[in-house]
Structures are given as C-alpha cells and as structure tokens.
Amino acid sequence: MKINYQELANNIKLWAKELGFQKVGICDVDLSQHEAALEQWLEAGYHGSMDWMARHGVMRARPDELHPGTIRVISARMDYLPPKAGFASNLKDPNQAYISRYALGRDYHKLIRNQLKKLGQKIEEEVEQLGYRPFVDSAPILERPLAEKAGLGWTGKHSLLLDKNAGSWFFLGELLVDIPLPVDTPVENQCGKCTACISSCPTNAILENGVIDARRCISYLTIENSGIIPEEFRSLMGNRIYGCDDCQLVCPWNREAEITQQADFHRRSSLGNSDLISLFSWDESTFLKNMEGSAIRRIGHIQWLRNLSIAMGNAPHSEAIISALQDRLGLDENLDIHIQWAIKQQSLVITSNRKEQRLIRIIEKGLPRDA
C-alpha cells in the first residue's frame, strides 16, 4: 500500500481540529540542541524538588528513546482561556482566592490524552500499521521545544510557547509516531525587546530570556512544592493559592486570545465562590469531592490549606480570618508553620503591593474583556 504522506499530514490536521485541537504541527525527533541547556538548568538546581526531571535527564530531549521507533512528533494545541476570566477583579479582592485559569475546569491531562489517542487510532485506520504513543506534560518529554519545532509558536522570555492568535493560553500534547510525515516550519520569535513578563514576575523567577528558577515561581511553590514555602515569598504570593498567571497577563500577545470552546475548561461550580475563609473551611472529604476531576486535587488537602493560609495572612485584618486560622492549628506540623505566620501577618498593617497594582492596571487596560 503506497501512502501519500503529505495528504495524510493534511488530513491529520483536519482530524485534530474535529477532535477539539486548535492547531497541529509535525516535527522530527532531533532535540540535541536543547540537551546542553537542559543539563545546565538541572545542574543549577532550578528544578527545585521536581526530582523526576533530573532522573530522566537528557532522555527528555530524546523522544525516540521514550518510544522506540519514533521518527515524527505530532504536536497539538488546545486553548483553555475560560469566558469571564475575571483576572483583575479577582486579583484586586484580597479576600478572594486566585487560581490559575488553566485549573478552573477539569484536569486537562486525561482529556487531551484521550483525544490524542483517538487521533492515533484514526491515523492507524489509514495506514493499517502504526506505532504511536500519546503524551501530555506529565511525561518526561520536552514538549515546548517540540511544539516550537513543529511551528506551533515561539518561546517567550517567560519560557511559555506563544502563538499570534492564541497568546499562551493553551495546553500542549504530543503524539509520537513511526511514519515519515512531512515536517512543518518553525515560526519566527516575535517578542522583540519586550520584557514585560520579566519585570512583572512577583518573585523575580524569570532570570533571563527563557530561563526560569522554579524555586522562586509561585506556580511551583503552590503546586509542585509540598514542603515549607520560604518566608521571603509568602507576602509576594498575595491571594494566589494555586498557580500564577502574571507573566501571561502582561504579555501583549494575550490581548486578543480566543476563548476556549471546550466547556470542560470553564470554571467549575464548586469554585464559583472563591472566598478564602469558605475554601479554608473545607474538610478533606469536601475538598476531594469538590475537586474531583480537577488538577487541583492532586496537591492534597493539607497543601490546599497551606496555600490558603498564606493568602489569608496577606488579606486585610479580620477577626474571622484569625479565628479560622486558629481553628486549624494542630492538624499538621508544616501547615502550622504557615498558619502561625499568617496569624502574625494579620496583626500587621498590610501595604499595597506596587507591582501587583501595576499588573491590575495593565489587565484592565489591555484585557478589558477578561478583566
């Protein structure tokens, strides 16, 4: 059976759109140019406690070792920006918890993996014999360099992939295949001299163009770090209890980003009320029930309370907050450290964070639809 691979590649992109992906590109598996930078980043310890990154090392840059026989990677993008994102209104109210917008709906891993699997099955029907494997970011693979190579966008200074139409509000997934599909052309970097993301990072986690010290990043601190959050970062976290979107919010390319068509990525009803005290009152069973099917669930109840306690410490003085914090003392040793800090903070006069106020003004001016 003779296969027209160019025609097949065109069809793959059509099928992917039918499965809910907004854009698809194809590349080869050579990521050798990224291996040295990856090793340097790991040696510097910028990955923090994410030991799995160091364990897999340069294998992350070798897709053909993850799935032997792989010669092409189909990289796919799925937009997640929810309607009525309410960025500015949320950040302006210190008594409301801020949750990164990618996590407001259902966990994307399973959904995207399932759609990639369906894409693989569709391709298999056409070529009769196909070796393939879907990956979403939980797997040890350098998905951003692959997506960049496949023409899905360019890497911003915040290390996220950027597309002219979608900004950076999207998930990535990969389908590794063993057929010689024609590859796509990378796009030109459009960031220019802009450094908005670097100057707006609350904790100065963006060290230089594309280099992130995860140990300083609020997303890492609230999600990947299960231990004690260093005191130097707590007040800078504000009301961000799960992730951080600041570097995306100031990016000019995100001003016209499209709203997701995937209803599963819309805000879940259990997060309709993000009042800090209300969320802090959830016991473990309530947390597990309300976060079923959510990416937030995997951090666990104690880490959820830890993050909330910091936000409560950063909120305006309130006897109700102090009482709620005191009621949780004794539940967990590490949690107590953060609660005691928060109680102490509540007794101080909280001054406005100038960088955060600037961020809110930028959102209201540049992202009025999503403010």
UniProtKB/Swiss-Prot annotation:
Positions with a binding annotation for [4Fe-4S] cluster 2: C201, C217, C244, C247
Chief location of this protein within or outside the cell: cytoplasm
Database matches in InterPro entries: 4Fe4S_Fe-S-bd, 4Fe4S_Fe_S_CS, QueG, QueG_DUF1730
Coiled coil residues, start to end: none
EC number(s) given by UniProt: 1.17.99.6
Positions annotated as active site in the UniProt record: D137
Cofactor(s) the protein needs: cob(II)alamin; [4Fe-4S] cluster
Cofactor binding, note field: Binds 2 [4Fe-4S] clusters per monomer.
GO biological processes: queuosine biosynthetic process; tRNA modification
Keyword 4Fe-4S applies: yes
Pathway: tRNA modification; tRNA-queuosine biosynthesis
GO molecular function, one term: metal ion binding
Residue stretches making up the 4Fe-4S ferredoxin-type domain: 179-211
Cysteines engaged in disulfide bonds, as pairs: none
Keywords: 4Fe-4S, Cytoplasm, Iron, Iron-sulfur, Metal-binding, Oxidoreductase, Queuosine biosynthesis, tRNA processing
Location within or outside the cell: Cytoplasm
Cellular component GO terms, alphabetical: cytoplasm
Broadest EC class assigned to this enzyme: oxidoreductase
HAMAP family per the UniProt record, alphabetical: QueG (MF_00916)
Subunit structure: Monomer.
Protein's name according to its UniProt entry: Epoxyqueuosine reductase
Organism annotation: Aliivibrio fischeri (strain ATCC 700601 / ES114) (Vibrio fischeri)
Taxonomic lineage of the native organism: Bacteria, Pseudomonadati, Pseudomonadota, Gammaproteobacteria, Vibrionales
Gene that produces this protein: queG
